[in-house]
Amino acid sequence: MNGIPMEHGLILASILFALGLVGLMMRRNMLFVLMSLEIMMNSAGLAFIVAGTRWGQPDGQVMFLLVITLAAAEASVGLALLLQLYRRFKTLDIDAASRLRG
């Protein structure tokens, strides 16, 4: 009994990446932008896992651990910015972030 074919895993990863990219470009709310970035990072991690499984190498799993670490750091910095944006301007709109510099 074989597992899921590599093509199906890569198609799923590319669909998730495309959905994250669309969410990143279409939304103005910073919370949804952060969620879209997380979806994109997880889809890249899924592609690493699928490729590593296909060739029987543990490199995909190691790269996935690095992707998860990067995603956690990105989420913590992004949520800190989100909190400051909401405290100062009472909005989560991305355009208000450009006024945060002053």
Curated annotation (Swiss-Prot):
It catalyses: a quinone + NADH + 5 H(+)(in) = a quinol + NAD(+) + 4 H(+)(out). It is an enzyme of class 7 (translocase). Belongs to the complex I subunit 4L family. It is found in: Cell inner membrane. The lineage of its organism: Bacteria, Pseudomonadati, Pseudomonadota, Gammaproteobacteria, Oceanospirillales. The chain crosses the membrane at residues 4-24, 30-50, 62-82. This is NADH-quinone oxidoreductase subunit K. Keywords: Cell inner membrane, Cell membrane, Membrane, NAD, Quinone, Translocase, Transmembrane, Transmembrane helix, Transport, Ubiquinone. It comes from Chromohalobacter salexigens (strain ATCC BAA-138 / DSM 3043 / CIP 106854 / NCIMB 13768 / 1H11). NDH-1 shuttles electrons from NADH, via FMN and iron-sulfur (Fe-S) centers, to quinones in the respiratory chain. The immediate electron acceptor for the enzyme in this species is believed to be ubiquinone. Couples the redox reaction to proton translocation (for every two electrons transferred, four hydrogen ions are translocated across the cytoplasmic membrane), and thus conserves the redox energy in a proton gradient. One of its GO terms (biological process) is ATP synthesis coupled electron transport. One of its GO terms (molecular function) is NADH:ubiquinone reductase (non-electrogenic) activity. GO terms for cellular component: NADH dehydrogenase complex; plasma membrane. Its EC number is 7.1.1.-. Coiled coil: none annotated. It is a multi-pass membrane protein. NDH-1 is composed of 14 different subunits. Subunits NuoA, H, J, K, L, M, N constitute the membrane sector of the complex.
